[in-house]
Amino acid sequence: MFADLDYDIEEDKLGIPTVPGKVTLQKDAQNLIGISIGGGAQYCPCLYIVQVFDNTPAALDGTVAAGDEITGVNGRSIKGKTKVEVAKMIQEVKGEVTIHYNKLQADPKQGMSLDIVLKKVKHRLVENMSSGTADALGLSRAILCNDGLVKRLEELERTAELYKGMTEHTKNLLRVFYELSQTHRAFGDVFSVIGVREPQPAASEAFVKFADAHRSIEKFGIRLLKTIKPMLTDLNTYLNKAIPDTRLTIKKYLDVKFEYLSYCLKVKEMDDEEYSCIALGEPLYRVSTGNYEYRLILRCRQEARARFSQMRKDVLEKMELLDQKHVQDIVFQLQRLVSTMSKYYNDCYAVLRDADVFPIEVDLAHTTLAYGLNQEEFTDGEEEEEEEDTAAGEPSRDTRGAAGPLDKGGSWCDS
């Protein structure tokens, strides 16, 4: 198509500047430099780099990137050549090859169009959908195969639930032990009072000894609380700081992932559009004018992929460290809990074994009599008042005897 025009067609650069340059690359053992080429005759006046593969001479050098235009190979111009011819030119050179290029000075923000934003939103929606649901809704899916982070996320959620359950159980355990220690303290106070008031020396000493044992158990319980409480703090730190921080990192990773997938989907759509126009024999404007829009998306995809790879690496490292901390921390916390409770029960057993004072001989008769001595009977004030009123209203027997018996009229008669 452009042979008749002799490539005398104005390029639509979309305001993106280019800077010429050249780079010499050392080929690898497979005689490759690690780039894929697109464009070229007969549909596009420019021949450009589509992708730079990882761990290849071009990627390790870092000079050329996706979207850069190739203008020559070892000083030979490639104007008017197809991408297959240029690939053969590069393969024919052994050892070092010099690539002449026009560097695309693209701004990634220029490629972040509304279409990319909407694609990111769509990816968020279909992330948790099954393939059947997405197909039924007519939503295309761009997913990462063998994404191990999905399983790691599920493991992280299970770990969070485990720590949450341990935290609640530890709180309840501390609360119960505190109430138990207060109960032992109350027992100690009661038996101490009984021992002080007990007149029998042997029984008094036994009650006091038993009271001291319960007070010691109360101290052991407080010591247990002080030892286990840092465990609760550590669990809360892991649950409320470490895991949320990892979730935030994963959230950032997902945002970068969806952006990268959106650019991948955009590139595929533009490729399909180009292939359709070629099949119909109709020229596509963006391809005929240098395909700068497509090259901009290629550059944005490459940079998004680099960010995605770095973020993925960071997330994997952070989750690996979190797993190691989880394994080490959970063992340490459980050992501290078991050892503390074991010491508590051993100390309680030792104290109660020494305080085996039962049966206690108590002289109940003597104690009851002693408690009952010198105690006046309690009388209610109201009963005393009633007795006084009765005494005032009824004459005494002496008075009635002096006056004689009552007559029929109810008056006293003399005998």
Swiss-Prot record:
Residues 376-415 are annotated as: Disordered. InterPro entries: AH/BAR_dom_sf, AH_dom, Arfaptin_fam, PDZ, PDZ_sf, PICK1_BAR. GO terms for cellular component: cytoskeleton; neuron projection; perinuclear region of cytoplasm; plasma membrane; postsynaptic density; postsynaptic early endosome; synaptic vesicle; trans-Golgi network membrane. GO terms for biological process: cellular response to decreased oxygen levels; cellular response to glucose starvation; dendritic spine maintenance; dendritic spine organization; glial cell development; intracellular protein transport; long-term synaptic depression; negative regulation of Arp2/3 complex-mediated actin nucleation. Residues 22-105 form the PDZ domain. This is PRKCA-binding protein. Keywords: Actin-binding, Calcium, Cytoplasm, Cytoskeleton, Lipoprotein, Membrane, Metal-binding, Palmitate, Phosphoprotein, Synapse, Synaptosome, Zinc. Monomer and homodimer. Interacts with CXADR. Interacts presynaptically with the glutamate receptors GRIA2, GRIA3, GRIK3, isoform 3 of GRIA4, isoform A of GRM4, GRM7 and GRM8; with NAPA and NAPB; and with BTG2. The interaction with NAPA and NAPB disrupts the interaction with GRIA2, conducting to the internalization of GRIA2. SMART domains: Arfaptin (SM01015), PDZ (SM00228). It comes from the Eukaryota. It holds the Pfam family PDZ. The AH domain mediates binding to F-actin. The unoccupied PDZ domain is probably involved in allosteric modulation by forming an intramolecular bridge with the AH domain leading to a 'closed' formation. Binding of a PDZ ligand, such as GRIA2, allows enhanced interactions with F-actin and the Arp2/3 complex thus enhanced inhibition of actin polymerization. It is found in: Cytoplasm, Perinuclear region; Membrane; Postsynaptic density; Synapse, Synaptosome. CDD domains: BAR_PICK1, PDZ_PICK1-like. It comes from Macaca fascicularis (Crab-eating macaque). Gene3D superfamilies: 2.30.42.10, Arfaptin homology (AH) domain/BAR domain. GO terms for molecular function: actin filament binding; Arp2/3 complex binding; metal ion binding; phospholipid binding; protein domain specific binding; protein kinase C binding. PANTHER family: ARFAPTIN-RELATED (PTHR12141), PRKCA-BINDING PROTEIN (PTHR12141:SF1). The modification Phosphothreonine is found at residue 82. Residues 144-357 form the AH domain. Probable adapter protein that bind to and organize the subcellular localization of a variety of membrane proteins containing some PDZ recognition sequence. Involved in the clustering of various receptors, possibly by acting at the receptor internalization level. Plays a role in synaptic plasticity by regulating the trafficking and internalization of AMPA receptors. May be regulated upon PRKCA activation. May regulate ASIC1/ASIC3 channel. It is a peripheral membrane protein; Lipid-anchor. Phosphorylation at Thr-82 appears to inhibit the interaction with AMPA receptors. Palmitoylation on Cys-413 is essential for long-term synaptic depression (LTD). A lipid is attached at residue 413 (S-palmitoyl cysteine). Zn(2+) binds at residues 44, 46. Residues 377-391 have a biased composition (Acidic residues).
